[in-house]
């Protein structure tokens, strides 16, 4: 039986204009696409979207430049596909969380997503160095992004917030889901030096666990 979070990932990753998932692992194209995603992710993290060069990505992947376009329509689709591949690394953890007792899911979800925002290289680069990715952001249809956000918000409300809150209406729950999303984005902006400032040093995993605990308890007490 497919988990709700896996269904959500499938809906998001099949949305036109938001990249594509890799072909099936047993397919002839899988190995080439996997290598391309790995090399391209490194280039996008190092150089940003505009300065990343398709020819150099192809060279790093050991293929001709034209071969890239057999798998990805353009640089934008390649970049968004790199994001999808990075986000899919979250899926096994989130599927495990779905099987947790209802009262434990929200906090576990927060810990996983906050940690992802701090450690996923491409997502972190996109959040913390938006000037390097401005050209890409301008190219993406805002309606597509809105639809994606609505799907994620619906999941967070139905699977994580509603089971542990009993005095909130739909608008309140949506507001909380939006706050959680904004908190995740804000964490992605944090520079690494923020955790080493004199007098307030904190390990990132302690930061993630403490923040998740505070938000979890705050929501449950609302």
Regions found by a protein language model. Name each.
Residues 19-20, 24, 124-146:
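Short, flexible, glycine-rich and Lys/Arg-enriched loop motifs at helix boundaries
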Residues 30-42, 46, 60, 77-100, ...:
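Alpha-helical structural segments
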């Amino acid at each position: 039986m497919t988990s709700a979070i896996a269904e959500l990932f499938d809906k998001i990753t099949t949305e036109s204009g938001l990249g594509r998932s890799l072909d099936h692992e047993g397919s002839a194209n899988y190995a080439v696409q996997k290598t391309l995603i790995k090399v391209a992710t490194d280039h996008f993290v190092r150089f940003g979207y505009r300065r990343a060069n398709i020819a150099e990505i192809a060279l790093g992947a050991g293929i001709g430049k034209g071969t890239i376009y057999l798998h990805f329509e353009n640089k934008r689709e390649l970049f968004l596909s790199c994001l999808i591949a990075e986000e899919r690394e979250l899926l096994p953890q989130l599927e495990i969380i779905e099987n947790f007792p209802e009262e434990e899911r929200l906090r576990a979800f927060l810990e996983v997503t906050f940690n992802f925002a701090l450690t996923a290289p491409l997502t972190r680069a996109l959040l913390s160095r938006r000037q390097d990715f401005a050209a890409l952001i301008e190219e993406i249809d805002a309606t597509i992004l809105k639809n994606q956000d609505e799907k994620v918000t619906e999941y967070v409300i139905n699977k994580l917030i509603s089971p542990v809150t009993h005095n909130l209406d739909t608008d309140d729950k949506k507001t909380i889901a939006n706050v959680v999303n904004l908190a995740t984005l804000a964490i992605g902006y944090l520079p690494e030096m923020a955790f080493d400032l004199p007098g307030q040093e904190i390990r990132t995993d302690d930061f993630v666990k403490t923040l998740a605990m505070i938000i979890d308890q705050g929501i449950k007490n609302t």
